[in-house]
Amino acid sequence: MALSFLSPSLSRLGLWASVVILMVTVLKLLSLLFRRQKLARALDSFPGPPKHWLFGHALEIQKTGGLDKVVTWTEQFPYAHPLWLGQFIVFLNIYEPDYAKAVYSRGDPKAAYVYDFFLQWIGKGLLVLEGPKWFQHRKLLTPGFHYDVLKPYVAIFAESTRVMLDKWEKKASENKSFDIFCDVGHMALDTLMKCTFGKGDSGLSHSDNSYYLAVSDLTLLMQQRIDSFQYHNDFIYWLTPHGRRFLRACQIAHDHTDHVIRQRKAALQDEKEQKKLQERRHLDFLDILLGARDESGIKLSDADLRAEVDTFMFEGHDTTTSGISWFLYCMALYPMHQQRCREEVREILGDRDSFQWDDLAQMTYLTMCMKECFRLYPPVPQVYRQLSKPVTFVDGRSLPAGSLISLHIYALHRNSAVWPDPEVFDPLRFSPENMTGRHPFAFMPFSAGPRNCIGQQFAMNEMKVVTALCLLRFEFSPDPSKIPIKVPQLILRSKNGIHLYLKPLGPGSGK
């Protein structure tokens, strides 16, 4: 009897709930349509390639890999063009120096649409912070990249590299090409562990190391999420196997970072441990962070510490891996330049068997080759901003505040209007006389402006030491049957690895 009395009320309640859900859905749809109309109006003055009625340019980019397709679009649409990801997300894709300067000289925040996916792992570190807190963190972290701090790292770079090269000696003896990318990634993470946490032995000599696997997994999963529209909603993503895998990897990475920070803080409370730290040859990145204070004496919170350490591990590991791997690929493709770099390094070392800080500045030809490699294969092929205020470009066209910008560094570096014969590998583009008068935003491997890469000197030093030691130990040549397939996955990777043949150069060649 009671149930029959309640059933009309429940029916009415269900009806009202359905009406409310329908109204919310309609309002949401109207909001999206209004937003799309507003975005389309803002981009009226920017013609672009034809797009799919539902997916925008996403299918074309997924089908072609996007990188070289955008390069062809630079010829059809000078300066920039709209890039639609579906019907409701659009970036102005720019690849011209004056357009890049108009945005990247200002310090606009990173585009939340892209970088919010990073928050679960790296938190609010320097990469995603904005406003006064970004400025405070940038100021606190800058001393960590002073040359006095960087000097002792040269020996650490060399130590980790030699472990990798010994492994390559065994692989080279099989007279088969092999993929260098994973080994370089292992070495780069090993180096970062030592420079960040001060570990004499990071424990990364085993392929099943949980932290290494977690960091590798996280970068791959983040790119997959950015590329898959169905994963953009948090609620949906965390219910998927990929989402759960991401959370597990995050937990492993966070547990490791928290453990190391707790250990170091405890050591700073112990007099004996304090003395050991003072007697160490160098400060590591964590030392710098723990000692950082602003003008008011305020230090970084535990959450800030973890965010900056995780950010440094993320940005410093994969980008360096990409830069070194593609550089060695370029050296394999161009044996004349490879030999000239090798001879330069031998001349600098003379009778010595180890590098010193002052040697790095003398690697002029190797540096030119490295920059030319970065031009053709930038470690980070795209970066994103969201305009905090309107911008007017050099040709008079403008965009309102809130607009999303994609700086396509890969297309900028291969833009024939900026770089003559852009597909030709020519290190002399970066000779002092040829660099004179070049637009400061024509070459942006480390971004540019106030939000440029704070660790670029650290990265350049590491890549010089690593590649110089590689060239002293081996002669590199390509495998024509396994040409790398470029793919952007936050960094520039190869879909099928970077397979090279290595020929040992014998005793006295840098071992």
UniProtKB/Swiss-Prot annotation:
| Entry keyword annotation includes Membrane | yes
Q: What is its main location?
A: endoplasmic reticulum
Entry EC number(s): 1.14.14.1
Q: Name one GO biological process term.
A: biphenyl metabolic process
**A Pfam family this protein belongs to?**
p450
What is its biological role? Answer: Responsible for mutagenic activation of 3-methoxy-4-aminoazobenzene (3-MeO-AAB); a potent procarcinogen. Also active on 2-aminofluorene and 2-aminoanthracene.
Q: What is this protein called?
A: Cytochrome P450 4B1
Q: Which gene encodes it?
A: Cyp4b1
